[in-house]
């Protein structure tokens, strides 16, 4: 297990945190390489139940260093709260936080919110955490680097530089913008709120390269899924970073990374939160959503529910260059009477559609045999009902990539290894 990258094959919420927590038992470092406080990875283990937003899911392994890579945008107060939460549960926190990561400030969250309000019905469905504005500032060379927290004079200078550029634009575009903090006030707030983790700031490339030389096990964790990738997702209803395995090296501080394994995590049905097209959307979603507990980990918004979309998932698996698949939440399908898989799209532009072409597509379904048994206690593939085995095998055939893990519940031990 020298290098494993865990990524999403769908639109996020596939259960990556659960898979990373399972794999982290043998990892020397668990690395987040993109995103920020805009999505949550739910982890259930001996410490409790956690919805991690910025900390890597391997934080619970006492022998594992948790790394926040340079490709991230870090919300400072939220990270402090997250660290306090896991510490309170008895976790020994071992962190390395990249000095090249970008800070996601309350001003960015305000800008994000004002833009969603301005867009009205055309809004992107943002979590309003400030992710897009923070990445935008980075691209415009106005971002605030994490490393400047240890250089207060530089921090103050760069915040003033950003405000001089940003505030006239915000006040012109959003008349209701009432942000009034000075650069001095923002600097002091940042120094206060980051006190719990400033000592962990470093050039993360050095410890990671040292671990590579030792042939240590490195575990890379993506946020969201291929369908939300900035380049290959359903633009403009995407996130603002690259969520593919190809970005793991760049975003983690190891640009020359060549991972041995890429695990694409796919849910056994489709779900999506935010704006965009879910081709396989169910007509009646409420009961299934409730039983599967499908609500956004950050916003609590109900996720749109659909049947397994083999077309979108295969596209995600290919984009991720996956060597294997982890299939999650198959236990939620027990008792479903109408079980089917979308094997193709019908309509114009059915091959590699870009929005809004996706909205005109209709699914071509293949009916599957349902099962009623409770499978949460199954620990081997052969112990699953025949219909459940056939469901997994059919998805595997459609993907062209082996399904090596099947989860039948949220607990660590509820994992079937094939």
From Swiss-Prot:
<dbReference type="GO" id="GO:0005525">
    <property type="term" value="F:GTP binding"/>
</dbReference>
<feature type="active site" description="Proton acceptor">
    <location>
        <position position="13"/>
    </location>
</feature>
<feature type="binding site" description="in other chain">
    <location>
        <begin position="13"/>
        <end position="16"/>
    </location>
    <ligand>
        <name>IMP</name>
    </ligand>
</feature>
<dbReference type="Pfam" id="PF00709">
    <property type="entry name" value="Adenylsucc_synt"/>
</dbReference>
<feature type="binding site" description="in other chain">
    <location>
        <begin position="38"/>
        <end position="41"/>
    </location>
    <ligand>
        <name>IMP</name>
    </ligand>
</feature>
<dbReference type="GO" id="GO:0004019">
    <property type="term" value="F:adenylosuccinate synthase activity"/>
</dbReference>
<keyword id="KW-0658">Purine biosynthesis</keyword>
<dbReference type="GO" id="GO:0044208">
    <property type="term" value="P:'de novo' AMP biosynthetic process"/>
</dbReference>
<feature type="binding site">
    <location>
        <position position="303"/>
    </location>
    <ligand>
        <name>GTP</name>
    </ligand>
</feature>
<keyword id="KW-0963">Cytoplasm</keyword>
<comment type="function">
    <text>Plays an important role in the de novo pathway of purine nucleotide biosynthesis. Catalyzes the first committed step in the biosynthesis of AMP from IMP.</text>
</comment>
<dbReference type="InterPro" id="IPR042110">
    <property type="entry name" value="Adenylosuccinate_synth_dom2"/>
</dbReference>
<dbReference type="InterPro" id="IPR001114">
    <property type="entry name" value="Adenylosuccinate_synthetase"/>
</dbReference>
<feature type="binding site">
    <location>
        <begin position="407"/>
        <end position="409"/>
    </location>
    <ligand>
        <name>GTP</name>
    </ligand>
</feature>
<keyword id="KW-0547">Nucleotide-binding</keyword>
<feature type="active site" description="Proton donor">
    <location>
        <position position="41"/>
    </location>
</feature>
<dbReference type="GO" id="GO:0046040">
    <property type="term" value="P:IMP metabolic process"/>
</dbReference>
<dbReference type="GO" id="GO:0000287">
    <property type="term" value="F:magnesium ion binding"/>
</dbReference>
<dbReference type="InterPro" id="IPR042109">
    <property type="entry name" value="Adenylosuccinate_synth_dom1"/>
</dbReference>
<dbReference type="GO" id="GO:0005737">
    <property type="term" value="C:cytoplasm"/>
</dbReference>
<feature type="binding site" description="in other chain">
    <location>
        <position position="239"/>
    </location>
    <ligand>
        <name>IMP</name>
    </ligand>
</feature>
<dbReference type="InterPro" id="IPR042111">
    <property type="entry name" value="Adenylosuccinate_synth_dom3"/>
</dbReference>
<keyword id="KW-0479">Metal-binding</keyword>
<feature type="binding site">
    <location>
        <position position="13"/>
    </location>
    <ligand>
        <name>Mg(2+)</name>
    </ligand>
</feature>
<feature type="binding site">
    <location>
        <position position="40"/>
    </location>
    <ligand>
        <name>Mg(2+)</name>
    </ligand>
</feature>
<keyword id="KW-0342">GTP-binding</keyword>
<comment type="similarity">
    <text>Belongs to the adenylosuccinate synthetase family.</text>
</comment>
<comment type="subunit">
    <text>Homodimer.</text>
</comment>
<feature type="binding site">
    <location>
        <begin position="40"/>
        <end position="42"/>
    </location>
    <ligand>
        <name>GTP</name>
    </ligand>
</feature>
<feature type="binding site" description="in other chain">
    <location>
        <position position="127"/>
    </location>
    <ligand>
        <name>IMP</name>
    </ligand>
</feature>
<comment type="pathway">
    <text>Purine metabolism; AMP biosynthesis via de novo pathway; AMP from IMP: step 1/2.</text>
</comment>
<keyword id="KW-0460">Magnesium</keyword>
<dbReference type="InterPro" id="IPR027417">
    <property type="entry name" value="P-loop_NTPase"/>
</dbReference>
<feature type="binding site">
    <location>
        <position position="141"/>
    </location>
    <ligand>
        <name>IMP</name>
    </ligand>
</feature>
<feature type="binding site">
    <location>
        <begin position="329"/>
        <end position="331"/>
    </location>
    <ligand>
        <name>GTP</name>
    </ligand>
</feature>
<feature type="binding site">
    <location>
        <begin position="12"/>
        <end position="18"/>
    </location>
    <ligand>
        <name>GTP</name>
    </ligand>
</feature>
<protein>
    <recommendedName>
        <fullName>Adenylosuccinate synthetase 2</fullName>
        <ecNumber>6.3.4.4</ecNumber>
    </recommendedName>
</protein>
<keyword id="KW-0436">Ligase</keyword>
<feature type="binding site" description="in other chain">
    <location>
        <position position="301"/>
    </location>
    <ligand>
        <name>IMP</name>
    </ligand>
</feature>
<feature type="binding site">
    <location>
        <begin position="297"/>
        <end position="303"/>
    </location>
    <ligand>
        <name>substrate</name>
    </ligand>
</feature>
